[in-house]
């Protein structure tokens, strides 16, 4: 019940933050911390990780989301990177000890603020750890799309053109984008559980 109760507070904190209700998000964050700091969290095991280790990942994730919605973007990125570090340090589990890769949020919010190269690095790293992860596929596609526009001098048609300052670079981006889009489309249309349209790498992104 400890992990379940904490997870409910975690989910509510993220939901309130992304609905713009920062005070409610902070209240849920405090309630989450009550469970996270419970001494029993160190003694309880969920598969291969302690509950304390799992909840330690969630704490900077919550604070990072809240900070971002408050406009404190650099503080948010620092917190989310800390959450990524903690998640990467969890013991191997099958299924994963934490089912939501923090990189979804980190990459998506970096991209939202125009940090295209940093976001691309985040998504590529996640795809190495979680091959064909549709959320990171979408994030990487969005990064490449933005790079394509920059390469074309601000064009928005998504196709290589004679005005491109670097035709070979444009061609490489277009080719990879098409491959990723095919992979994502096949994945989302071939399974009975793929019934949700992924529009962003994370639901926290606008």
What is the predicted function of each stretch?
Residues 1-2:
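Short, small-residue-biased leader/transition segments that mark boundaries at the very start
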Residues 11, 55-58, 62, 105, ...:
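"A position-specific structural signal for the A-helix of alpha-solenoid helical repeats
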Residues 16, 67, 110, 144-147, ...:
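Residue at a conserved register position within TPR or TPR-like alpha-solenoid repeats
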């Amino acid at each position: 019940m400890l992990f379940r109760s904490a997870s409910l507070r975690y989910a509510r904190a993220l939901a309130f933050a992304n609905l713009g209700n920062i005070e409610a998000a902070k209240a849920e964050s405090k309630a989450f911390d009550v469970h996270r700091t419970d001494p029993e969290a160190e003694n309880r095991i969920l598969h291969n990780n302690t509950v304390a280790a799992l909840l330690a990942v969630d704490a900077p994730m919550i604070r990072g989301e809240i900070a971002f919605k408050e406009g404190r973007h650099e503080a948010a990125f620092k917190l989310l990177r800390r959450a990524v570090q903690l998640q990467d340090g969890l013991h191997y589990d099958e299924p994963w000890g934490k089912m939501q890769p923090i990189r979804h949020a980190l990459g998506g919010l970096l991209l939202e603020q125009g940090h295209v190269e940093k976001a691309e690095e985040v998504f590529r790293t996640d795809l190495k750890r979680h091959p064909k992860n549709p959320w990171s596929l979408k994030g990487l596609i969005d990064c490449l799309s933005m790079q394509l526009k920059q390469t074309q001098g601000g064009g928005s048609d998504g196709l290589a053109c004679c005005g491109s300052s670097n035709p070979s670079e444009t061609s490489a981006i277009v080719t990879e984008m098409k491959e990723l889009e095919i992979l994502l489309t096949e994945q989302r249309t071939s399974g009975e559980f793929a019934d949700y349209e992924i529009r962003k790498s994370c639901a926290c992104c606008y």
